[in-house]
């Protein structure tokens, strides 16, 4: 028996899909045969990344500007993607931000900035997608929420209690949505990366990166591409009985 994951004739929306983990997932979806709608907020290179993906993999791929924290805007853009590239069959809710400060320095603006994207933004995207599927009667929708191993741990010596808390919140949000939307045949799962070579980890000096990598059983940070396989599986029919789960792709960090 041959086991392959094929997303041909599918369409996937990837928020934050023009860089880091999101870009790797956009590329992986396209490589598996899916059309891809990349959501970006302010990056100038998003349209270039979409064009490159389209040419390399021979699929439709377009970039759409959208602040995921604006509920009405998300609904408008998702409807547009569904009309232009769709029907959309899956969502990777990847967009996220972090502010690294000591707890005594945080303020409400920091909280709002992080939770508006990492929690409310994820909800907006999942809600908009689920509404489209409900309205059109589509019953095989899959949502993959990119959380973090920080949903479970504090990641010392980094001081990012708001980020960690937002990931704990979004992981539980995903479980709640999975339970509520199961009757609609909409699956919701969380993929929680460990340390990955992205812009978010590039601020660390080499000494800190070495310290963090030494705490991982596999003794290294992951490449963004190493996150994509699990996401593709969760989007595919091969995972048709998987919902409400949180899957850690962390090099064994949580068992160390």
UniProtKB/Swiss-Prot annotation:
It holds the Pfam family adh_short_C2. Its EC number is 1.1.1.138. Keywords: NADP, Oxidoreductase. The active site is at residues 148, 163, 167. Gene3D superfamilies: NAD(P)-binding Rossmann-like Domain. One of its GO terms (molecular function) is NADP binding. NADP(+) binds at residues 21, 49, 67, 94, 163, 167, 196, 198, 200. It catalyses: D-mannitol + NADP(+) = D-fructose + NADPH + H(+). InterPro entries: NAD(P)-bd_dom_sf, Sc_DH/Rdtase_CS, SDR_fam. CDD domains: MDH-like_SDR_c. It is an enzyme of class 1 (oxidoreductase). Belongs to the short-chain dehydrogenases/reductases (SDR) family. May be involved in hexitol or pentitol metabolism. This is Probable NADP-dependent mannitol dehydrogenase.
